[in-house]
Amino acid sequence: MAADTSRPSLRQAQRAVTEQRIIEALAALIDQEHPLEISMAAVAKRAGVSEPTLYRHFPTKRDLFAALAGYQFRTVAAGLAPASADDLAAAVHTVFQRSAGMENVVRWTLAATDPERVPRPNVQARLAMLRTALGDQAGRDDGTTQFLLRTVLLLTSPMAWLYWKDYLGLEPADAAATAGWAIKTLAGAAR
């Protein structure tokens, strides 16, 4: 009889749980100190794993930061599948609220000045989500499509909320309303 491959093996499930603990430990440590000053030993200790276990899952700090960036994206985008510009404008509210709950992680993963240390592994997933939401507007072959995608990419980024928070004191809901208005206005104008 063939083995059931639709479910992860116990080993795969344990690996996923361990990796999640390690990533969550790093996220918690980022709330306490600058990410570049966090040692792998501190992450292992916080996660309750040995250093060899940590290195088996994440051989380098760069690998660990890439996993953190993926975790940040999955956390703020979980369950979102906007199918229109209106859906996208509404989804921004959720993205910004969730980002507020992990502000220091968002700041680090999106604002780090050295992309070699903090890779951006979710760019294609974000662009695909935007293309789906913008539908016909994103399917044109003129320059409008690229301008619209680039602008909406920025408006839907948690960095937009952080910028508005830092410079204008906006809460996530107010920033989302601003971004949502701009998305709907731009998408309407691009038709």
Task: Explain the meaning of each model-derived region.
Residues 28-32, 37-38, 66-94:
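Amphipathic alpha-helical linker/stalk segments
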Residues 48-58:
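Short hydrophobic/aromatic patch on the recognition helix
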Residues 90-93, 97, 115-150, 156, ...:
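Amphipathic alpha-helical packing segments from all-alpha helical-bundle domains
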